[in-house]
Amino acid sequence: MKNDNGQQLSLTQALDLLKSRQGKNFKTADKIIENFCFYDYSNIIMKYDYKSGKKRILNILNSELDVENLNELPCDEKLTFSNAYYSWVTAIFVDIRKSTELFTNENKKDVSRLIRSFTSEIIEIINQGDNLREIGIRGDCVYGIFTTPKKSQINEVFDMACYVNTMIKMLNKLLIKEDIPQIMVGIGVSSAQELVVKAGRKGSGVNNKVWIGDAVTKAANMSGKGNKNHNLPIIISELTYKNLNDHNKGLMSSRKYNDDLDYYYDCDLIISAFNDWINKGMLDNE
């Protein structure tokens, strides 16, 4: 942007000038736009070929996508930039409560040990079986996505949530001994038919799966609500609940509703043998 004398202004100077003019009722968009000029970015190192970018976008928007409706989601090798799969999946997300306070703790080394311990054991619990299709870490959250065409497989993911909940109890007892702050987590589990596509830049080596549907989104949202606002640590979607066996259904709370989550159920379940071992002092020889 230039001033009335034709001099190029910095961003701060331009904003100050606009504010001063707006104070004099200089508010119409046309008048403001007249005072803008395009800056020459030719000397900037970063380059983006926007003409080629337009062609790439149009190629993607006009390309055919071969969508296969499958019971069981195949492994990554079969997913390409030109196909997609539609299948039943169940996602589990484990999110640390009050992580902002935790990460601003002055003792960075203790926080790093805590986070490494947390992620290590969540991954150990989730990274099991042939049904896992994606596992990862998003900030302070660990997640896993499973192909679950059978009810028994959905129950297995629910069991993982209970193991995670019990493991946090073990972790906190160990943290107390090391004089490191304890943590609370929210655990979200959700099931749905999901469309999975491969996204990224073909040929760049930068790509990942994108999950389109309710399972992953809801599980992530639910993990953010667990152990918060009177919710218990484990929150599951209504569809996940409907696919639990009768024993697991009987362990859940009554049906709840939230504008962000829709209908859901929560619980604070633990694995009894694991919990007994914790309560007995976590002795290695027992």
Swiss-Prot record:
Reaction(s) this enzyme catalyzes, per UniProt: UTP = 3',5'-cyclic UMP + diphosphate
Record-listed Mn(2+) 2 binding positions: D95, I96, D140
Keyword hit for Cytoplasm: yes
Entry's Gene Ontology BP terms: cyclic nucleotide biosynthetic process; defense response to virus; intracellular signal transduction
Enzyme class: lyase
Cofactor(s) in the UniProt record: Mn(2+)
Domain Guanylate cyclase: 90-223
Sequence positions that bind a ribonucleoside 5'-triphosphate: F93
Residues that hold Mn(2+) 1 according to the record: D95, D140
Location of the protein in the cell: Cytoplasm
Molecular function terms, GO-annotated: adenylate cyclase activity; metal ion binding; nucleotide binding
GO cellular-component term (any): cytoplasm
Keyword terms: Antiviral defense, Cytoplasm, Lyase, Manganese, Metal-binding, Nucleotide-binding
Role description: Pycsar (pyrimidine cyclase system for antiphage resistance) provides immunity against bacteriophage. The pyrimidine cyclase (PycC) synthesizes cyclic nucleotides in response to infection; these serve as specific second messenger signals. The signals activate the adjacent effector, leading to bacterial cell death and abortive phage infection. A clade C Pycsar system.
SUBUNIT field: Homodimer.
Name the record gives this protein: Uridylate cyclase
Gene from which the chain derives: pycC
